[in-house]
Amino acid sequence: MIDIRSPAPGRVLAVGLTQLIRRGLRGVWVRGDLPISAAVWAANHHSWWDGFVAAAVLRERQRPAALLMDGDTLNAFRFLRSVGVISAQRPRQALQALREGRVLVIFPEGELCSPGPLRRVAPGAGWLGRQAPAAVVPVAVRVISRGHQYPDAFVDISPEVAPADLPAALTSRLAELDAAIRREDPRLPVPGFRCAVRGRVSWDERITRWAGLIRR
């Protein structure tokens, strides 16, 4: 999603989707790097925000991208085609996106699930990686309310794995991400993550800043 080479209407929509992130979340925090070549971004899907978060991270890194979506859902939101969304029922189009060097965002659980451990992983992400060929990259994502007014999105990008190893690697990475979040004071940043997209400032953060200015 968010192909930087999209026509003008698509680019306008891409900017609007990034603003949605900035207004709805406290920020998007990232650990890890993607390969410089084409890649399958294979992530858990436990939040409404997941597709938007992936798009914002890839836009921030200036990576041309596409997102695989269920065909019925895409038919209901046809305008998303202009920002690189592809029907899951069109594998040739997905392969073409990878062969053009894009990052293809896919949620191999196949549906939006409640937050928790990874569910069953369908083989599609690995198949696309083998056929393109392209790197298969497990990406753990967690959107969570911590110690501030607005939720934080954490994106933990793993090194490339063999397609057959994707389920185990993504399961492990998601568990590691959840453990890292639990270990840290909810009011403090999680070590090792950088802010890729800054969003809303909580009232408590504003009050702290004002108090600091008054004391000067």
Model-derived segments and their meaning:
Residues 20, 72, 141-142:
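An acidic- and aromatic-residue-enriched active-site/binding cleft used to recognize and process polar
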Residues 33-89:
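Catalytic core of membrane glycerolipid acyltransferases/transacylases, capturing the structured
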Residues 14-15, 52, 74, 91-92, ...:
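Residue-level marker for well-ordered alpha-helical positions
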Residues 2-5, 9, 37, 90-216:
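Non-catalytic C-terminal accessory region of glycerolipid acyltransferases
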